[in-house]
Each structure stands twice: as structure tokens, then as C-alpha cells.
């Protein structure tokens, strides 16, 4: 089948773009949106027996109220290190350690802080779009090389480039939708 290598390139580009969008999704989850969410602590690491360990491996994290996160360590001896890890993550949160669990009150966001968070979200979206464009560029170059090497017609090249652009547009729309959704969450008082 003459267009198999081209289809492989398109599939690979689609996969890589999806990975970029997926990474953006996880980044946006860690950006605070007014109410408490365990995802806010997703990137926190804790020193546990001499190595940096993700928080979710040493404690359970829950948000029993819209303005409170509770961290329940699996090992009580790790509670101080967990508290230190949360402070080091520089999330602007003040954990309260009662010896058994850590309570983290989530203060309401000021208008200024909301705008900063929206800007951070926009930056993440722009980084993702740049990544998608770079993947498109690389795939386009690969397609051109295959077309030249296999002596395919110009029509095959244009068709493949159109398909690649459609894939790119779909992922870019997803990024825009995620950004819009996050902006609404942040600005919703």
C-alpha cells in the first residue's frame, strides 16, 4: 500500500499531539480554580526515607469541603516531611499539622490572583500549541521526504498535508476548549 508510510507519520503525529494535550490537561489541573481539589497537590514531592517521593504515594489527599484539603499520611512518621514538601512546592498554601493529618485551608482567590492564574493557564496553552506546531512541522518534513523517496505524486503530498493540518486543527481546538474551561473555573467566584 503506497500511503502506509504516510499514514504511519500521520498516526504518530496525532499520538504526539495527544500527549502534548494530555500533559497540558495535567498541568491545568494543578492550577487552582477557587475551590479545593486534591489535584492541586499533584506535583508535590516529599522526602521519604531519603528519596523524593510523590505525595500520593505516602498519603491520601481529599477535599472534604470546597475550602479545605486534608492530607492523611499512610505513615505518621512522615507527617513533618509531608508538611515540608507542601511548603517547598510554593503553592501559597499554609498547611496545619495536628500530628495525625494535615489540614490545608484554601483561602478565596483575590481578583488579582485570579487574573494571574488565567495568565498562567494561557501560557500553558501557548506552550502546548507551540509543541503541536513543532510536531506538525516535523511530520510535514517526514511526509515530504517519503513523497520524494517513493516518487509519489504531488496530489499524495497535498492530501497528506491536508490530513496533517486537520489533525493539528483538532488538537488546537481541544487546547482552546481546555483553556476556556479553565478560565471560566478560575473566574467563577
From Swiss-Prot:
SUPFAM superfamilies: Ribosome recycling factor, RRF. GO terms for biological process: translational termination. It is found in: Cytoplasm. Gene3D superfamilies: 3.30.1360.40, Ribosome-recycling factor. One of its GO terms (molecular function) is ribosomal large subunit binding. Responsible for the release of ribosomes from messenger RNA at the termination of protein biosynthesis. May increase the efficiency of translation by recycling ribosomes from one round of translation to another. This is Ribosome-recycling factor. The lineage of its organism: Bacteria, Pseudomonadati, Rhodothermota, Rhodothermia, Rhodothermales. The gene is frr.
Amino acid at each position: 500500500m503506497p500511503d502506509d508510510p504516510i499514514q504511519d507519520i500521520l498516526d504518530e503525529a496525532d499520538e504526539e499531539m495527544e500527549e502534548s494535550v494530555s500533559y497540558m490537561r495535567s498541568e491545568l489541573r494543578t492550577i487552582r480554580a477557587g475551590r479545593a481539589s486534591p489535584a492541586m497537590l499533584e506535583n508535590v514531592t516529599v522526602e521519604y526515607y531519603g528519596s523524593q517521593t510523590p505525595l500520593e504515594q505516602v498519603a491520601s489527599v481529599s477535599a472534604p469541603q470546597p475550602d479545605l484539603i486534608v492530607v492523611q499520611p499512610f505513615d505518621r512518621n512522615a507527617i513533618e516531611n509531608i508538611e515540608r514538601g507542601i511548603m517547598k512546592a510554593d503553592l501559597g498554601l499554609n498547611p496545619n499539622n495536628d500530628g495525625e493529618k494535615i489540614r490545608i485551608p484554601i483561602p478565596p482567590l483575590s481578583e488579582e490572583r485570579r487574573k494571574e492564574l488565567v495568565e498562567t493557564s494561557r501560557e500553558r496553552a501557548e506552550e502546548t500549541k507551540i509543541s503541536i506546531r513543532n510536531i506538525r512541522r516535523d511530520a510535514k518534513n517526514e511526509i515530504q521526504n517519503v513523497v520524494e523517496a517513493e516518487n509519489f505524486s504531488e496530489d499524495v503530498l497535498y492530501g497528506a498535508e491536508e490530513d496533517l493540518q486537520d489533525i493539528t486543527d483538532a488538537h488546537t481546538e481541544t487546547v482552546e476548549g481546555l483553556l476556556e474551561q479553565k478560565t471560566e473555573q478560575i473566574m467563577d467566584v
